[in-house]
Amino acid sequence: MAESMVTDPIYLDETAKANGAKLDLLNATMLGVSASLGVLAKAQTGIFEEMDYNAIKAVVDAGSAPITFPTGTQLVNTYTGKDGKAYDCPWDVVQPDDTAEGESGATVPAMVLQMHYATLYDLQFSAYQAFYVVPDGGLVAGTYNVKMGLNWGNNVKTDAVYQFTLTKAAPAGARLTGFYNAPDVVPANWKVYVYKDQQKSELLETCSVTAGSAGTNLGTFLAKENGDLNGLHPVGYGDNRWWKSAYRQYLNSDAAAGAWWQPQDKWDMKPDQADTLPGFLSGFSDDFKSALSRVKVVTYGNGVTDDGSAVVTYDKIFLPSLQEIYCSPQVSGEGSYWPYWKERTGAKTPQALWQTYPLRITRDLAQRTVGRNVRLRSANRGGGSSAFHVGSSGGVSTWTGIIALRSAPACKITKLA
């Protein structure tokens, strides 16, 4: 079934007036391409007309998107929640004049769309990561210890040693997790959890942690991976790297609940919501899903648990970066700025981090007066566990990977396969 489009840019009333001339030109342009579009989207407030995504892609590929779909235009489709309730889902044209690179290396014209409202459901960027993979042969019942090789927050101190006791053997391939929120939780409240596998199909044991060096040493914790131990940053608060995030898998899947998540490395653990949320794309029509292409997305590492270099992924749906939403990035190169956000905020230069901007508030798809916290894909380069987000009051700051938030994701409309 074809989707719907509204051509009025609603992001600011003033912008609607300023774009009047553009919309007149839009109307004229659409007359010229109506044979291929099959319909005419009239440039009048509140007019919705059915559109064909193949026709939209043809306009983009011809280089006509900046005239036909100026910044702020909305393409409106339908999103159906897991309860079967359907919502009009506007996508803002945030950059009508872009390019996209496919997995083959081909580069084509592209138009960038971003959801105007926040997604319906909260999701962790990343679960707490495992700190130890039980080797072949398993771990026998007994006492084990780990040493701290870093200072972190109030409670992680270099050279401190902590022990825990397994009351039964842990099988090969089991994952040890724990030390959750370590810098902010007193050691007396730390725990170690033994899971059968990365899917957390069975919690085999929960162990108390105490100060002490009894038993077998498993290694020394650093912020990053060290020997047989994962880095304490992603262990304590989740991972902040887009390439391995649960959020990336969720946004790019239409699989049923329980079927869209797979571990991305040996430390990765299933997020809490994976068994109850279907993949994000499951809420859209086949027409919309078939219009999406995997495009090159660049995201930098954090410089703590990795070397901080750029990582390339190919995604149909992706979270925006700081740079794309016209904020001052910690590192340049995660895309180019989208003019929508410059116009929406009225900013003359990219806006500073750690400040609050009410014009950046993203509201809920179902409750359109309610502001939501929305994830970005940019990692906080000062640590291995926090990624940026825009808060429900418009603040631009970070939150740890394990916190479940909404998002306002983006996609690129192109002629790529």
Spans of model-derived segments:
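Short, low-complexity N-terminal tether/leader segments at secretion or assembly junctions of large
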Residues: 1-31
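Collagenous Gly-X-Y triple-helix signature in extracellular proteins
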Residues: 31-132, 136-138, 145-153, 157-417
